[in-house]
Regions:
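Alpha-helical scaffold segments in soluble metabolic enzymes
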Residues: 1-8, 51, 55-58, 71, ...
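Short glycine/serine/threonine-rich phosphate/pyrophosphate-binding segments
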Residues: 1-5, 26-28, 66-71, 90-93, ...
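Glycine-rich phosphate/diphosphate-binding loop of Rossmann-like nucleotide-binding domains
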Residues: 1-64
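Intrinsic disorder and flexible coil segments
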Residues: 10-11, 23, 50, 55-57, ...
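Surface-exposed beta-strand edges and their flanking turn/coil or helix-capping segments
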Residues: 31, 74, 119-122
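Ser/Thr-centered flexible coil motifs
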Residues: 32-34, 69, 139, 159
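Rossmann-like adenosine-cofactor binding region
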Residues: 37-105, 110-112
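Adenosine-phosphate binding glycine-rich loop
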Residues: 84-183
Length: 185
């Protein structure tokens, strides 16, 4: 779903290399393939996650804990974006990323780290919008609108009542605050 959404937002087909438990999903691979994986297969010499991460701008992880190493992160392009969203433990921790990359933007699915990626940020509002317009399905345009609204909200000043819910944290747009916190109205 994530890759389909970013492709709907304009990422070219060849701009994403997907991996599963057997490695890179590439044109010509036979092991473990199905119609959904085949739809995202690309022409590449990369065969492993480590290969795919060399020079990558972005990593979206939705797999298992500790599947990304510091060496993989170090091999990425400048200013990499790393969304390690496996729960309860991410593919790589923010501490491990910061140890090798001070320029990285990092997000996880955990509330005890900055930039928590959590469906609580989108579901109530997407459903409210769908109900308001009597939509029978939630389409890409709705998902894109929600993503853009969250991005805009993260750039706004954080209200005092939200700051009070997060004592001691600096909540302002930057590497450690690209996603609003759940209590932001």
């Amino acid at each position: 779903a994530c890759v389909e959404l970013i492709k709907a937002m304009g990422l070219p087909h060849e701009g994403a290399i997907l991996c599963d438990s057997k490695g890179v999903i590439y044109n010509g691979r036979e092991a473990g393939m199905n119609q959904w994986k085949s739809a995202h297969a690309v022409d590449t010499d990369a065969r492993s996650l480590a290969d795919a991460m060399v020079g990558a701008d972005v990593f979206f992880g939705l797999s298992v804990a500790d599947s990304v190493t510091q060496d993989m992160v170090a091999s990425m392009a400048d200013n990499p974006i790393i969304f390690a969203m496996a729960n309860p433990d991410p593919e790589i921790t923010p501490e491990d990323v910061k140890a090798v990359r001070q320029d990285a933007i990092m997000a996880t699915g955990r509330s005890d780290y900055p930039n928590q990626v959590n469906n609580v940020l989108g579901f109530p509002y997407i459903f409210r919008g769908a109900l308001d317009v009597r939509a029978s399905t939630i389409n890409d345009e709705m998902k894109i609108a929600a993503a853009r609204a969250l991005a805009e909200l993260a750039r706004e000043d954080v209200p005092d009542e939200v700051l009070a819910a997060y004592p001691g944290e600096r909540l302002h747009y930057g590497r450690d605050y690209i996603i609003p916190v759940p209590f932001d109205p």
